[in-house]
A protein has these predicted regions:
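Active-site cores that bind ATP or allylic diphosphates and position pyrophosphate for catalysis
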Residues: 1-37, 43, 192, 196
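Catalytic adenosine-cofactor/nucleotide-binding cores of aminoacyl-tRNA synthetases and other
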Residues: 22-170
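Basic, alpha-helical terminal appendages of large translation-related enzymes
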Residues: 138, 142-208
Length: 208
């Protein structure tokens, strides 16, 4: 319709309308996202798993290039957002103008020290089996001491997003192997050994 309208305008001697080239959203296979197929991820789902700012950054970059929009792209997009925020702390005015998060936040990039990437946080959710923010925060504080939660509002929101993403996306695709007899005996021995450890033992002592 853009091409046709341009031809019509030329025929009547008027100025061509300004156009904007854009591409469609694609799923992980490179196919067009369709409501009937249910492929890809919706905007609402993204906002269940990550912040609006991470989505704004993803949309901001390469507007003329087709974008893949599916569940597994979210952690990467969030980590890119965190990296740009981290870079902004040491950038001058000119460099900030080239930083997309400066535009996403209307010139007020939040200043927050990065604790860990979103991908690493997802790994922590998986290994710790944490089902709530309070428990996951305890594991985070074991990784990095002297953290005050209220000083990390962005990361605090990521803690909640990570649990939701793991339960909805990662956990549903996990397949657990049924142990054979030899593996079962080894696991039972491990459980027995861990059960005999006292509370005062350090993680290093337990592992040795």
């Amino acid at each position: 319709s853009a091409i046709l309208s341009t031809k019509i305008i030329k025929l009547i001697g008027k100025r061509n309308p300004s156009g904007f080239a854009y591409e469609l959203f694609l799923d992980e296979k490179g196919e067009k996202i369709s409501k009937s197929k249910g492929n890809g991820i919706t905007i609402e789902q993204w906002l269940d798993y990550a912040s609006p700012e991470s989505l704004s950054l993803y949309m901001y970059q390469n507007p003329k290039r087709a974008k893949k929009l599916y569940n597994e792209i979210v952690p990467k997009a969030v980590d890119e957002y965190l990296e740009f925020i981290e870079k902004a702390k040491n950038q001058d005015e000119l460099e900030l103008l080239m930083n997309p998060t400066w535009h996403v936040h209307n010139g007020n990039v939040p200043k927050e020290n990065l604790i860990m990437s979103f991908s690493m946080l997802l790994n922590l959710v998986e290994t710790s089996n944490a089902e709530n923010k309070e428990l996951l925060w305890k594991f985070v504080k074991k990784y990095k001491d002297n953290i005050i939660e209220k000083e990390h509002p962005i990361f605090d929101s990521l803690v909640g997003y990570a649990i939701k993403y793991f339960n909805d996306v990662i956990k549903t695709k996990k397949k657990y192997k049924t142990p054979n007899q030899q593996e079962k005996k080894a696991l039972e021995a491990l459980i027995k050994t861990l059960g005999s450890c006292n509370d005062k033992m350090s993680p290093e002592d337990i592992q040795t």
